[in-house]
């Protein structure tokens, strides 16, 4: 399988290039960065592209890849419901193309989201805290937003979080994602971390995941690269590849 990388000179992108080159069953074709022509992916007969770029360019990248029949594995964040809908519309015209978009490729992070969804209906209160390096472009992180949505869906028949706060500085209680408070921290020295805090009478539960190095994303990305062509259309998250759905 012939694999290209968009954002190849970025920190995550460079890690993906090394991972593809080290895989016996994959062939690295080309890396494309800002200012480079996307046509290089066609010229090198690339089958699958790994995209770790920026929310401001990822939609243009996807339109090009779908139009040219190149499968995409996307780790770039910033996908709103509207963006997901747009990708689905593009794919409807290209039924042979496949796109997998995941808010997080670290297996532990995916499992922590799954565990949080399972725990959600057993606790009265829940909040999400995500912690990242200060160069991250979006807040809250895609992982935190998806975690909150999964928790909210699991709690749809439950009352809202109890919270008597009536006054305070704007933003002090975090962002609201489908009724779940989400707090974002940006701090030098961090990579990618998340805590989900549950509370009820007499007990609390904390589910925490830490990516200490960007290599934590590699197993999930390579799994997606190998499987994406088997799933025409749009797949969100690697949970289906791990039999977690």
UniProtKB/Swiss-Prot annotation:
Location(s), subcellular: Cytoplasm
Keyword DNA damage: no
InterPro entries: DapB_C (IPR022663), DapB_N (IPR000846), DapB_N_CS (IPR022664), DHDPR_bac (IPR023940), NAD(P)-bd_dom_sf (IPR036291)
Listed GO CC annotations: cytosol
Active site: 132 (proton donor/acceptor), 136 (proton donor)
Pathway assignment: Amino-acid biosynthesis; L-lysine biosynthesis via DAP pathway; (S)-tetrahydrodipicolinate from L-aspartate: step 4/4
Superkingdom field: Bacteria
Reactions catalysed according to its record: (S)-2,3,4,5-tetrahydrodipicolinate + NAD(+) + H2O = (2S,4S)-4-hydroxy-2,3,4,5-tetrahydrodipicolinate + NADH + H(+); (S)-2,3,4,5-tetrahydrodipicolinate + NADP(+) + H2O = (2S,4S)-4-hydroxy-2,3,4,5-tetrahydrodipicolinate + NADPH + H(+)
EC numbers, comma separated: 1.17.1.8
UniProt binding sites for (S)-2,3,4,5-tetrahydrodipicolinate: 133, 142-143
Binding site for NAD(+): 7-12, 75-77, 102-105
Gene3D superfamilies: Dihydrodipicolinate Reductase, domain 2, NAD(P)-binding Rossmann-like Domain
A GO MF term: NAD binding
Keywords: Amino-acid biosynthesis, Cytoplasm, Diaminopimelate biosynthesis, Lysine biosynthesis, NAD, NADP, Oxidoreductase
Entries under PROSITE patterns matching the protein: DAPB (PS01298)
NCBIfam families with a match to the protein in the record: dapB
Purpose of the protein: Catalyzes the conversion of 4-hydroxy-tetrahydrodipicolinate (HTPA) to tetrahydrodipicolinate.
Similarity annotation: Belongs to the DapB family.
Protein's name according to its UniProt entry: 4-hydroxy-tetrahydrodipicolinate reductase
